[in-house]
Design a protein with these regions (language model features):
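Pyridoxal 5′-phosphate
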Residues: 1-375
Length: 375
């Protein structure tokens, strides 16, 4: 199989990730629930992973990072924890349903209102587009760092500079581990990230960074192993947002995934640029194909999507898989607003997304097979 659906999840992980997961399943007890060695080892491992994530994202205090089930969980925690009755939110036209649906749910209940800042035809959201949607009641701005449909990267630093001190939530689902993120440059900004994509951790892992200058309500409450005598949820992080048993094996694997990315960041970036260039140039040569987003590797991550004249993108994806063993994704990619922006609501798109463990030969073969079935 040629696996080119890394934007959904990285299927192939570093061997250290598999080993860490297995070791934790065999040896790790419940962190914070006992003073014996296995529980202490689990607690130390979780803290080590927290520290690795903090270092990768330029975060001074690792305890401001809370572990979640995935980026969707992180985004819901942030959105529903920041927005109050009467609040106004600004999202962009490139957001995933993990943002749109919780915001829409709150609006449907008449709790909040929201506006959508439009992106340009390349899927890029300018800071000015967001500024134009701000109101006195705006309590949160939500921006995807990189599009899961066309790969376009938004300038989160310029957006932060031009939106004053309004709380900002960055969805790093497609950028974490692929684009350098420095939270020291982003005041009053939350960061939601998955563990199973560009960080090469297992599925069922994610995180949310909550800065000290922001107040976020809890989505869930429960046992934390701390302040057990009180019916009140602990107010200190990370315990405030980590109720119940954590995914200890998953977090162990995530720690090794982050270690791998941190130690090989530049090499991974250059490798994925080469693969992305092969996919872009190959698709541009196909008759009847329209590439989405920028037509070079600049200003984008390794998500390469296209539409084809008179061809159904889901059928093309299925044909690539069934006939040639090429795993890609066709359709709307859980991002209807993005497809509306790009003019692909009816057709959807065929998406290729390379990862660190793909080869140039695989990318070239994928383009060759696409040509055979699309032309």
């Amino acid at each position: 199989m040629i696996y080119l659906d890394n934007a959904a999840t990285t299927l192939i992980k570093p061997e250290t990730v598999y080993s860490a997961v297995l070791n934790a399943m065999k040896c790790a007890a419940n962190a914070g629930r006992g003073g014996y060695s296995e529980a202490s080892a689990a607690m130390n491992m979780i803290y080590d992973t927290r520290c690795r994530a903090a270092e990768l994202f330029g975060i001074d205090n690792p305890e401001r990072i809370v572990f979640t089930q995935n980026a969707t969980h992180s985004l819901n925690t942030a959105i529903k924890g920041v927005l109050k009755y009467g609040s106004h939110a600004v999202i962009t036209s490139m957001e995933h349903n993990s943002v749109l649906r919780p915001v829409f749910s709150l609006a449907r209940k008449k709790m909040i209102t929201y506006s959508v800042a439009p992106a340009d035809r390349y899927g890029c959201v300018a800071a000015e587009s967001i500024v134009n949607e701000l109101k006195p009641s705006t309590a949160l701005i939500v921006v995807t760092h990189a599009s899961n449909v066309c790969g376009t990267v938004n300038d989160i630093y310029d957006i932060r500079r031009k939106t004053d001190d309004i709380p900002l939530l960055i969805d790093a689902s497609q950028s974490a581990g692929l684009v350098k993120i420095d939270m020291k440059r982003l005041k009053k900004t939350l960061l939601a990230f998955p563990g199973h994509k560009g960080l090469y951790g297992p599925q069922g892992t994610g995180g949310l960074y909550i800065p000290e200058d922001m107040e976020v309500s809890t989505l869930t409450e429960g046992g934390t192993g701390s302040v057990s005598e009180s019916p009140m949820q602990p107010q200190f992080l990370p315990d405030r947002f980590e109720s119940g048993t954590l995914n200890t094996p998953g977090i162990a694997g995530l720690g090794m995934g982050i270690k791998y990315v941190s130690e090989n960041f530049d090499e991974i970036s250059e490798h994925e640029k080469k693969l992305t260039a092969i996919l872009i140039e190959g698709i541009k040569k196909l008759s009847g194909a329209r590439l989405l987003g920028y037509d070079s590797t600049e200003g984008r991550v390794g998500v390469v999507s296209a539409v084809f004249f008179d061809r159904d993108c889901v059928e093309l994806a299925n044909a690539l898989g069934e006939s040639f063993g090429v795993a890609v994704r066709g359709g709307l990619h859980c991002s209807p607003l993005a497809h509306k922006t790009l003019g692909t609501t009816l057709s959807g798109a065929l998406r290729f997304s390379a990862g660190a463990f793909n080869t140039e030969d695989e990318a070239e073969k994928a383009v060759y097979y696409l040509k055979k079935i699309a032309e």
